[in-house]
């Protein structure tokens, strides 16, 4: 895992998660964590409102939150994912909806497991090329599945107003089951083309399960929502 001072080239940082998780750290402990990185506590505790925080402040906040997660949570790899999991993997990406108002999907394969990371596209950062955006309407799209999954993460669900069409309430008819969500993520991953990019990430687990492929073989699916995604040399 990393920390402030470790060189990373971030492409995605969830300010919504940073805000929520910072608020859950007791003040005395937050002060000690900030001191470990020689960070001004006032910058760490700055409230994110309409504008995104300066990049330096964002990364300082991320360093503190990541350290707290490392120490307090069971952070696993991809083999036996716990509540938080991390990895380095070659992923493809796609935005469903507008480039700044859509939902973002990173997806790849790891030892026969489909890995899918879902988040809001407005958390994309950096100067790299943005993933391809597909203008898909709500009906008949992946959006009901994505929104249903993101309901399991308080920060992303509270942040859903940033995403187009998210103000439409999900009805029971719209809301897919876990098995339907797993299958739709598999189908979506198969439709994303283009080269894989090597990334490293830390994500919160949303759903883990297995579906049978057309030949009857089990396909394991791990779906999460990332705190951050950064470039790495891994491309498999």
Ranges and model annotations:
Residues 1-29, 50-111:
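Membrane pore-forming effector domains from diverse proteins
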Residues 5, 10-11, 38, 147, ...:
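Compositionally biased, low-structure terminal segments
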Residues 11, 32-35, 61-64, 70, ...:
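Sequence-pattern detector for short linear motifs
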Residues 29-52:
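Polybasic, Ser/Thr-rich amphipathic helices
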Residues 93-236:
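Long, helix-rich, hydrophobic modules that act as membrane-proximal anchors or helical bundle/coiled-coil regulators
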């Amino acid at each position: 895992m990393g920390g402030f001072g470790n060189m990373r080239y971030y492409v995605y940082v969830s300010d919504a998660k940073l805000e929520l998780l910072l608020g859950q750290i007791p003040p005395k402990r937050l002060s000690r964590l900030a001191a470990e990185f020689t960070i001004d506590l006032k910058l760490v505790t700055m409230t994110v409102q309409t504008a995104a925080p300066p990049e330096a402040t964002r990364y300082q906040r991320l360093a503190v939150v990541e350290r707290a997660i490392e120490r307090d949570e069971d952070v696993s790899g991809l083999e036996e994912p716990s509540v938080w999991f991390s990895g380095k993997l070659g992923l493809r990406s796609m935005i469903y909806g507008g480039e700044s108002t859509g939902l973002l999907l990173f997806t790849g394969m790891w030892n026969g497991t489909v890995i899918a990371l879902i988040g809001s596209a407005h958390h994309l950062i950096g100067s790299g090329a943005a993933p391809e955006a597909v203008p898909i309407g709500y009906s008949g799209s992946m959006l009901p599945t994505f929104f249903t999954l993101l309901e399991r993460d308080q920060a992303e669900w509270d942040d859903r107003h940033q995403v187009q069409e998210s103000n439409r309430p999900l009805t029971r008819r719209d809301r897919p089951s876990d098995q339907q969500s797993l299958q739709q993520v598999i189908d979506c991953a198969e439709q994303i083309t283009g080269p894989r990019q090597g990334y490293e990430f830390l994500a919160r687990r949303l759903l883990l399960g297995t579906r049978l492929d057309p030949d009857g073989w089990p396909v394991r699916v791990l779906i999460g929502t990332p705190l951050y995604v950064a470039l790495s040399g891994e491309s498999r």
